[in-house]
């Protein structure tokens, strides 16, 4: 009941965004049930137009594009959730350590975060990804390691404001444990963490798509970025409206997902 009450209080825009994101999540979970063919099956005739047997046709290798798109939901959404959760958790933990351990730790971690923020995240991520082994695990690791500083900076400021409050100060005075202090801080910090998790998922999809598009992602992962790259490599993409069923679906999947995440955490005027 409490959850329903909270949903009713949301604006129409945010409810639409939540519905879209729920659709993405369910599609990612249930994709194997709806995929007519395996994403690795290339036994079909190449470059078939959309029809009853292939809703979005086939690519140059004979893969069913609809199956590749659904598989992209699985891989890209899972990668976004894992990368978003880990980068948010890492940034929040380091922010807590900076505030809890004192001035020396705060200065060191803040300087370290500022060092990462000098160069745009995407530039650093692409540079490191070029030299790392092209696996999905390394893609997640690179995204997490180079996208936590912004989380750290904002959450650190929030914790500094909250740690001077009476509840936390009383816990510190009574020699409470680290977990006791964290428990007192969590209610005040949780809304910021939730917003950052959504934003980090947003960035993870954009970064993975960019890495796959430029050929430095996992070559075996059937993601939306990989499908977009394959479509762009097809020399006759814009002949006979091929782009409408080859390029537009994965681009639309990325754009709708990213925009829905962004609008979900954007304050309305």
Named regions from a protein language model:
Residues 31-34, 79-113, 126, 267:
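Transmembrane-helix boundary motif in ABC transporter permease subunits
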Residues 1-39, 109-112, 189, 252-256:
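N-terminal signal-anchor/first transmembrane alpha helix
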Residues 145-146, 198-199, 239-269:
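C-terminal transmembrane helix and the adjacent membrane-cytosol boundary/short C-terminal tail
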Residues 77-90, 179-211:
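Transmembrane alpha-helices
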Residues 84, 103, 134-182, 192-201:
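Membrane-cytosol interface at the C-terminal ends of specific transmembrane alpha-helices
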Residues 130, 207-248:
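Glycine-rich helix-loop "coupling/hinge" segments at transmembrane-helix boundaries
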Residues 55, 59, 99-162:
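Generic hydrophobic transmembrane alpha-helix motif, especially the helices
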């Amino acid at each position: 009941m409490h959850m329903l009450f909270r949903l009713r209080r949301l604006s129409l825009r945010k409810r639409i965004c939540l519905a879209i994101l729920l659709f993405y999540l369910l599609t990612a979970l249930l994709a194997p049930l709806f995929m007519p063919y395996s994403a690795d099956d290339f036994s079909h005739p190449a470059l078939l137009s959309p029809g009853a047997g292939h809703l979005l046709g086939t690519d140059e290798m004979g893969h069913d594009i609809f199956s590749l798109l659904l598989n992209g939901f699985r891989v890209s959404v899972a990668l976004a959730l894992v990368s978003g959760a880990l980068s948010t958790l890492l940034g929040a933990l380091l922010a807590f350590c900076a505030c809890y351990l004192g001035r020396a730790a705060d200065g060191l971690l803040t300087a370290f975060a500022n060092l990462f923020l000098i160069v745009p995240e995407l530039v650093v991520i692409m540079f490191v990804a070029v030299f790392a082994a092209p696996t999905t695990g390394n893609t997640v690791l690179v995204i997490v390691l180079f996208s936590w500083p912004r989380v750290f900076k904002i959450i650190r400021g929030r914790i500094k404001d909250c740690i001077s409050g009476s509840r936390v100060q009383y816990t510190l005075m009574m020699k409470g444990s680290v977990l006791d202090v964290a428990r007192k801080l969590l209610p005040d910090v949780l809304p910021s963490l939730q917003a950052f998790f959504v934003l980090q998922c947003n960035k993870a999809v954009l970064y993975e798509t960019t890495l796959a598009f430029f050929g430095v992602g996992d070559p075996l992962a059937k993601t939306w970025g990989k499908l977009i790259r394959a479509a762009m490599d097809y020399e006759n993409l814009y002949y006979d409206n091929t782009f409408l069923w080859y390029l537009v679906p994965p681009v639309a999947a990325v754009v709708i997902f990213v925009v829905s995440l962004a609008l979900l955490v954007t304050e309305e005027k």
